């Protein structure tokens, strides 16, 4: 099953997440199909907290990809900010 989920990056105590489309059988930080954005929960000042390619997310959801709970909330926030 294809899922849209977070893949952790960054340093210790400084998380940074790539929002990726991946097969659910692959490891969290393992192989992915496509990177559709990022989420930086530790952003400061003018740094971007969230960037998401909503067109690609819509494409993957239309083809049957499931979203994780956290990514679903991030998509909702991105849509609200874009409107």
Swiss-Prot record:
GO terms for molecular function: structural constituent of ribosome. GO terms for biological process: translation. InterPro entries: Ribosomal_bS16, Ribosomal_bS16_CS, Ribosomal_bS16_dom_sf. Gene3D superfamilies: 3.30.1320.10. GO terms for cellular component: cytoplasm; small ribosomal subunit. Pfam families: Ribosomal_S16 (PF00886). SUPFAM superfamilies: Ribosomal protein S16. HAMAP family: Ribosomal_bS16 (MF_00385). This is Small ribosomal subunit protein bS16. It comes from Shewanella sediminis (strain HAW-EB3).
